[in-house]
Amino acid sequence: MDLVALTYTSRSASGLTPRDVDLIHRAAITYNPLDGITGLLVYNGNGFMQIIEGAESAVDDLMSRITADIRHNELEVRDRRSQAERCFPHWSMYRVDVSPSFERGLSGVEDAVTQMIDASMRAVVVSSLAAISTPA
């Protein structure tokens, strides 16, 4: 199996509610195990940053569904890489809600996942959070 990790950012659609974000997360934790997907979902009130891990075909299929989802605007794939092993093997989709402020948002994500990602993935996370953050 070719294991890939894909990181994307998107702006949340206007009028997105906390319940909508809960529904996105619940769908991920329900369906991702069926497709062999694991990862991390970060929401900061402005947008999403997500790392999706799995077989290349499963990741591509999921990204097609996310791209078509009207709850996401300005979706941008920020990184795609082959991996020898998963960063988040036990998380069908771990969710971290953080502050819209870049500095506080980064701190929240680092607290949750710093031991699980390498330096190059950390750089992707930092630049991705910056893309969806508001000034401090």
Could you describe each region identified by the protein language model?
Residues 1-136:
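Charge-rich, low-complexity N-terminal segments
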